[in-house]
Amino acid sequence: MTEEDNEATITESKKELSKGQQAKKEFLDKGNKLPLCVNEGCNNDVVVREWKYWSFKSECGRCINARKKGLKIPDVKIHKKDFCENNDGHLGFLCPVKTNLWKDFLESLDLDHLDGDHMNNTPDNVKTYCKLCHNRKSKDTGDWNSNKPSRRDID
């Protein structure tokens, strides 16, 4: 292989995008924008969980880090609760864990988009559920449907 052929191969390989890079490019080329952090008073973009599937978290990195460290950000109200909001049984079943027990298991609480659409990242569409209630709610409502419009996969 000549040096010229080698340079052409390197240039060609730089042009190839991974599936995640392709998905990000497609997302942005369609005019989409990342949702804003769900926390009141924060105007940062959310963290991308996985570009390949257009999967986004509900919060920005700054808010996630501050919340996990128990720090307050001036003029920002953290939306995520320190208990499962299904403690009243509004999902049609009661959360099996008592509200006062969550303080030692905060990593087992998720932010759930009620309509299943992660682009609709408004406080009235996002609730805190434990992993047990979140999984059951998602299964019952079809949020796990990989063909829903808010989910994307590039073949």
Tell where the protein language model's regions lie, with residue ranges.
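Short linker/helix segments within small regulatory modules
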Residues: 48-58, 73-77, 110-127
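Short Cys/His-centered divalent metal-binding micro-motifs
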Residues: 65-68, 126-150
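BZIP DNA-binding basic region
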Residues: 11, 33-65
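Cysteine-rich micro-motifs
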Residues: 51-66, 96-103, 125-129, 133
